[in-house]
């Protein structure tokens, strides 16, 4: 019985571009709704909690990836540990994440373009963006990864420029006003807001595990993935 494998074409830079590119959209949109739910200070606590969770998750995920370099990701790991049923459950959960995340990002792209070009239908722009990215992936993972690397570098530069522009006007005293879910005092509403804001804090890290799932297409995954 022959085993079909994917061609390893991705280097460390490609994997870095995939990892950062998958999550950097969360720095542009999505997370800011957490301020409305938890307040600035409450959302800061939420973000630190989620960051700790994702740090543990990624270290564990990377270890699994280097041990089992399979494009199935969680499906392959769970199948090895819990059998076909466990693999199916993990695979379906991962599929749901990666099926629904791209349309959400495409809609955000459409909304951004609509701000710059009011006459442009954001839904049509979203469909166009989705088709472009889908075509790039069909053409080949190397082409798609190179394109994502270039776009990711540009996105990082834009964020740094934005932070440099707004930093002189930052006021910590304004930042902490009503910082606990609309109150200046930490209490039960603040705790509720902290937990309610978890989905928005996840936007900072959502889909970062996608880089590890490219292990089967990575050159020397035991070295390149941890570096990325």
Task: Describe the function of each predicted region.
Residues 5-10, 35-36, 78-82, 182-190, ...:
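Helix-boundary and loop/linker segments of multi-pass membrane transporters
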Residues 40-48, 120, 150-228:
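Helix-loop-helix junctions that connect adjacent transmembrane segments
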Residues 27, 63, 97, 148, ...:
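Acidic-residue sensor for enzyme active/binding pockets
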Residues 33-37, 45-46, 55-138, 143, ...:
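Hydrophobic transmembrane alpha-helices that form the core helical bundles
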Residues 1-44, 54-59, 68-71, 179-181:
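Membrane-interface "cap" regions at the ends of multi-pass membrane proteins
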